[in-house]
Amino acid sequence: MRDNKVSPKPFFFASPERREVFPAKTKEKITRKESREHLARFNLACELVKVIRHFFPELLSLLKRVEDPRHQSYIIYSNHVLLMTRILSSIFYINSMRSTSGEFNDETVIENIGVLCGEELRELPYWETINNYLKRFSSDELQKVVCRLVYRLIRSRAFEDARLRGKYWQIIIDGTQLYRSRKDLGEHSLFCRKKKGTEEEYTEYYYYVLEAKVVLHEKIQVSILTEFIENEKREVDKQDCEQEGAKRLMERLKEEFPMLQICICGDSLYASEGFFKECRRKKWKYILRYKEGSIPSINQEYQVLKRREKNRVEEPEGVYDYVTGVDYRGESINVIEYESAKEKKKFLL
């Protein structure tokens, strides 16, 4: 184990189908510590297979059903082998496909991946083969697989305790910047002017992506949908933005999970009349981190009402105050203010 990350080769050191735990062809004595480490590697390989087969028994069949863009007469590796190899490289924290070819170039690794894929493999696909395949591969196909796997997790009832009030699944919407460069990243990239009006003015280009993640446990958040924030072309009057991307993401979420009881969680960026109406139209609940200044009228009314209603409660973990039914253009907003005793921080929701 390196830097608290499982090293890929030891993780797949022994096949779960094998009876022997230790190498048969060795004349060297191993220490007790090495014995424990080797046994741990064997157990980890077995546990990975168990997790996949228990929680995601459909994974292999779903990967087999994705549309293959290649000419079927000229392929050597099935699409599910290519995809499974790439998925495993991510699980093992391998940062590049070139490194994957080196790390996975081992008879036992090849055998184990073959077990997962249901095929007898002599070799694994080279990194260039996988990259060329992914360039032609539609990301929408993989998105369908992700949604299906998440749907199974939700239906399994293994994470029922994660529901708010025993009913609503928390879906966190959050944005992440992927790249930033002074070099033009393409016509779809976003851009901003830095040091505007000075001799040092320059343009910075970047990509931004929104993720919708379902909370299954306080330490487990699983991505459901991905939405890129990007311009249709370089010359635009108004650039794409996170709020518009969130609208598209919410529409897709409703299409994929029309009956799911959802509580959307996000930051103050989404606090707007349009967002509130969208949630009401979709029959969703929402919890937003509120910052003073995003909608001043809400904070002003809250400050007046909390002095009048006196709902303040003090507990060892912290102090909280709340006001229900704050009106904002016909929307009834509940505001909660919480101050953690441990962190000495205030939060407005």
Which role does the model predict for each range below?
Residues 85, 100-101, 126, 130, ...:
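Short, conserved catalytic/metal-binding motifs centered on acidic residues
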Residues 285-349:
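An anionic, glycine-rich sequence signature occurring as long contiguous blocks
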Residues 97-118:
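DNA-recognition alpha helix
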Residues 52-84, 119, 128-131:
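Basic, short loop/linker segments at the boundary and entry of helix-turn-helix/winged-helix-like folds
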Residues 236-298:
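Domain-level cores of phosphate- or acyl-group-handling catalytic modules
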Residues 194-261:
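Electropositive, glycine- and tryptophan-enriched low-complexity nucleic-acid-binding patches
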